């Protein structure tokens, strides 16, 4: 049975709050409540989250919590954590939260001791990562491993690539990580051209070991390695490991199945960075820091599972997104980390959020009655300020934005004078942007500065641009885990309100099937007959210019 949120009383209340918020400004909201920042700031899992620069007030937050309760949010959170099959289209549990269970936790799902299974794989990952880091794992020529190349796509790439970059200062064992995902041969060439096969190890990440792009890249890497080893196929077992559940295909490739690390069908790819998919990350930062990474996830899980909705950060942020998406008509959401090391975080969130909530039917197959799925995008600050912030400040579109910053840098440099801190300069920009977006600058204020009348309108900053500020003390493994889990749970909250399945991705599957169907024609092996004239003409043009 479907849940139509638009028929509920809290939805009607939220519509009234939208009308009220449209008629006010953030300047007015702050002026009327000196305690606003304190009342709308929250702490959980080492994160400080300030929601005060959003277009909400106490009555709006009350409507959020009422709507969450009306949707059965608490019961649905419990169902996910308990391993019920909430992914109804694939009849699966959704248990990424189990990947970070404590070692003494108990969770049995579908007759399996999930906690024990998770920690068995983690133990094997620790042993493998330790062997790379202490030099006991040797390649075909007895060299130690200096570079680990992760070959995967989607969730098998974006998560570990993002996290490895984010935690680069924790790479203490001299092991470098590179990532290949695109079936475009330029991706593999660019990586292999820099590497020494004797000291390179490949992690092939594919649950089924049949993913088209991943297998194409894996075989290219295998040919490169075997050629360097003088044609010795046995070298493969010393330079390849797999993250997969298909032992037969893994062995057929030449990988020793003792070096195959599994995960489960209750883990979606975009939720898998803290599973065996994180093997490359663990190898780079070490098992201890990887466990701290999991601790951060678990701390946010516990907050989400137990906190009252009035102070539950993922619930409030998820409801904010619904509010902006369905009432204000905001179609996009900017994520702006003021941390170069978090530069891949917006791309990671694109898959997490858009693959999860880019749906147009509800659980029962009926059409949704709301807008769903914001478009996520962003770049690190301050780069974004000199690229697209102009549109956020003075454009005609409302673009809610999340600003992410840290109190202490892992590394710092002096400013141009040699006396100040570049990190302080970075954060000065961070605070200035959220201030200007919220409060802007009026025509009267600009005119009072002596600006010529013909320029006043051009310089007006409307303000009232909503932002959420997320801060942590440092970008640590714990903080990154908590940050990822925060957004995972935001996705869940939105999915509950919209009554969509956030854990399937049929739109991705059809594209894969069509690509396989068209491949023979694209390769010139069969006549072009795709079923539509446009695709036929495009493939024919491609073939005629391919040479």
From Swiss-Prot:
One Pfam family, short name: PGI
Highest taxon above the source species: Bacteria
Broad EC category: isomerase
Keyword Isomerase among record annotations: yes
Active site feature: 355, 386, 512
A single GO molecular function term of this UniProt record: carbohydrate derivative binding
Record-level GO BP terms: gluconeogenesis; glucose 6-phosphate metabolic process; glycolytic process
Pathway field: Carbohydrate biosynthesis; gluconeogenesis; Carbohydrate degradation; glycolysis; D-glyceraldehyde 3-phosphate and glycerone phosphate from D-glucose: step 2/4
EC number annotated for this UniProt entry: 5.3.1.9
SUPFAM superfamilies attached to this UniProt entry: SIS domain
Annotated InterPro entries: G6P_Isomerase (IPR001672), G6P_Isomerase_C (IPR023096), Phosphoglucose_isomerase_CS (IPR018189), SIS_dom_sf (IPR046348), SIS_PGI_1 (IPR035476), SIS_PGI_2 (IPR035482)
The keyword Cytoplasm is assigned to this record: yes
Compartments, record wording: Cytoplasm
Entry GO terms, CC: cytosol
Major location (coarse): cytoplasm
Reaction it catalyzes: alpha-D-glucose 6-phosphate = beta-D-fructose 6-phosphate
Function: Catalyzes the reversible isomerization of glucose-6-phosphate to fructose-6-phosphate.
HAMAP family: G6P_isomerase
Alphabetical list of PANTHER family matching this protein: GLUCOSE-6-PHOSPHATE ISOMERASE
Family of the protein in this entry: Belongs to the GPI family.
Protein name per its UniProtKB record: Glucose-6-phosphate isomerase
């Amino acid at each position: 049975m479907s849940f139509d949120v638009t028929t509920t009383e809290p939805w009607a209340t939220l519509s009234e709050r939208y009308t009220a918020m449209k008629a006010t400004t953030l300047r007015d909201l702050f002026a009327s409540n000196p305690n606003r920042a304190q009342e709308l700031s929250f702490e959980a899992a080492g994160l400080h989250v300030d929601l005060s620069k959003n277009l909400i007030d106490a009555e709006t937050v009350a409507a959020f919590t009422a709507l969450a309760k009306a949707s059965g949010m608490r019961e649905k959170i419990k169902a996910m954590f308990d391993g019920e099959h909430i992914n109804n289209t694939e009849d699966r549990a959704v248990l990424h939260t189990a990947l970070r269970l404590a070692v003494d936790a108990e969770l049995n799902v579908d007759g399996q001791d999930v906690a024990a299974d998770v920690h068995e794989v983690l133990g094997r990952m620790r042993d493998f990562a330790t062997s790379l880091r202490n030099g006991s794992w040797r390649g075909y020529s007895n060299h130690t491993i200096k570079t680990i190349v992760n070959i995967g796509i989607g969730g098998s790439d974006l998560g570990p690539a993002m996290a490895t970059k984010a935690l680069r200062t924790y790479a203490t064992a001299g092991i470098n990580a590179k990532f290949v995902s695109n079936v475009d041969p330029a991706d593999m060439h660019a990586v292999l051209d820099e590497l020494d096969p004797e000291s390179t190890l490949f992690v092939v990440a594919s649950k089924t070991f049949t993913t088209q792009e991943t297998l194409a890249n894996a075989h290219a890497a295998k040919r490169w390695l075997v050629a360097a080893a003088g044609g010795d196929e046995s070298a493969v077992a010393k330079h390849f490991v797999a993250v997969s559940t298909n032992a037969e295909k893994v062995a057929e490739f030449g990988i020793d199945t003792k070096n195959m690390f599994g995960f489960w069908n209750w883990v979606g790819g975009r939720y898998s960075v803290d599973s065996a998919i994180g093997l490359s990350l663990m190898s780079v930062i070490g098992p201890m820091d990887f466990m701290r990474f999991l601790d951060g996830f678990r701390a946010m899980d516990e907050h989400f599972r137990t906190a009252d909705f009035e102070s539950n950060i993922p619930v409030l942020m998820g409801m904010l997104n619904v509010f902006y998406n369905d009432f204000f008509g905001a179609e996009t959401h900017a994520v702006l980390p003021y941390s170069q090391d978090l530069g891949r975080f917006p791309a990671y969130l694109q898959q997490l959020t858009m693959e999860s909530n880019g749906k147009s039917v509800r659980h029962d197959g009926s059409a949704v009655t709301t807008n769903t799925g914001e478009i996520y995008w962003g770049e690190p600050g301050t780069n974004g300020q000199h690229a697209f912030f102009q549109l956020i400040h003075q454009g005609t579109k409302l673009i809610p934005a999340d600003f992410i910053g840290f109190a202490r840098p892992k590394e710092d440099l002096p400013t141009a004078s040699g006396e100040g801190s570049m990190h302080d300069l970075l954060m000065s920009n961070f605070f200035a942007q959220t201030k200007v977006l919220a409060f802007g600058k009026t025509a009267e204020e600009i005119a009072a500065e002596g600006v010529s009348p013909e320029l006043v309108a051009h310089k007006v900053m409307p303000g009232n641009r909503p932002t959420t500020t997320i801060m942590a003390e440092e970008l640590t493994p714990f903080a990154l885990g908590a940050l990822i889990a925060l957004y995972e749970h935001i996705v869940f909250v939105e999915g509950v309100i919209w009554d969509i399945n956030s854990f399937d991705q049929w739109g991705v599957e059809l594209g894969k099937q069509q690509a396989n169907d068209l491949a023979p024609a694209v390769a010139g092996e069969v006549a072009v007959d795709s079923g539509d004239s446009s695709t036929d003409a495009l493939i024919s043009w491609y073939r005629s210019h391919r040479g």
